[in-house]
Amino acid sequence: MLLILLSVALLALSSAESSSEDVSQEESLFLISGKPEGRRPQGGNQPQRPPPPPGKPQGPPPQGGNQSQGPPPPPGKPEGRPPQGGNQSQGPPPHPGKPERPPPQGGNQSQGPPPHPGKPESRPPQGGHQSQGPPPTPGKPEGPPPQGGNQSQGTPPPPGKPEGRPPQGGNQSQGPPPHPGKPERPPPQGGNQSHRPPPPPGKPERPPPQGGNQSQGPPPHPGKPEGPPPQEGNKSRSARSPPGKPQGPPQQEGNKPQGPPPPGKPQGPPPAGGNPQQPQAPPAGKPQGPPPPPQGGRPPRPAQGQQPPQ
């Protein structure tokens, strides 16, 4: 359609200019005087429809090619103004009182009519290589899109509702500071020597990890603190458990991650890892039989504060 309209407009340039100007002036006089008459076809290869009668506001017919602007509507009866001709035709503007989106414009055409006051509408995109969408409505903040690169910084969560931060990729990434009142754990930065801070009292939430050489488990639910999951790496130290529900940190062994222990059952700290995996000690308050023989030849050490195996 665009190519056809452009070609017709270029062919009708020489003959359409003079005749279309004369016809448009005569039609404007007819409409203003209150006697609407049928429009004569303007010069070129694109005839036009007759104008709508007064009293019934309708959109004017589209104008094509390089023809001049149509006549204005009569006073006292608002109608949408016809678009000014560029190299392409354009549909009619929306009716007053019923806001609708005007049709998009393409190419080198002029801008369509603005939306009616009192009822905001999105403006139609202007043709060319620079199109812009409608601005977001105030009162509903939206998060900016993530920025990529080697030094990206995530956006802070909205106040009042702390949530986990999205993972940040890159070699030098730094998360935003937590909001006062509801402390959150800052995410550890990647490397081979990571140190996980102790969880603050209240509602601790753990943000997802940042890119590096180690993996980190999902954050625990607020109100139910759990032991932190193990970290991969050569030298990892586990965090201290929050006050109120003592739990032992999970078993750490080399480069083999292991899931966190279940909440609600206090356990002593299992032996720290070598390469052979050792069984966990029985929970306090529930004495059990002797543990199974260890794997790898190292005998298991009894946990602190628990009864020795009978």
Curated annotation (Swiss-Prot):
Region described as 9.5 X 21 AA tandem repeats of K-P-[EQ]-[GR]-[PR]-[PR]-P-Q-G-G-N-Q-[PS]-[QH]-[RG]-[PT]-P-P-[PH]-P-G: 35-234
Composition bias, Pro residues: 48-63, 133-147, 196-210, 217-231, 258-310
Coiled-coil region list: none
Glycosylation sites: 66, 87, 108, 150, 171, 192, 213, 234
Source organism superkingdom: Eukaryota
Region (Disordered) residue spans: 14-310
Sequence repeat ranges, renumbered to this chain: 35-55, 56-76, 77-97, 98-118, 119-139, 140-160, 161-181, 182-202, 203-223, 224-234
GO cellular component terms, semicolon-separated: extracellular region
Location (main, coarse): secreted
Post-translational modification: N-glycosylated.
Localisation: Secreted
Membrane-spanning residues: none
Signal peptide: 1-16
Assigned keywords, A-Z: Glycoprotein, Pyrrolidone carboxylic acid, Repeat, Secreted, Signal
InterPro entries: Pro-rich
Presence of keyword Heme: no
Protein name in the entry: Basic salivary proline-rich protein 4
Species whose genome carries this gene: Homo sapiens (Human)
Organism taxonomic ancestry: Eukaryota, Metazoa, Chordata, Craniata, Vertebrata
Gene: PRB4
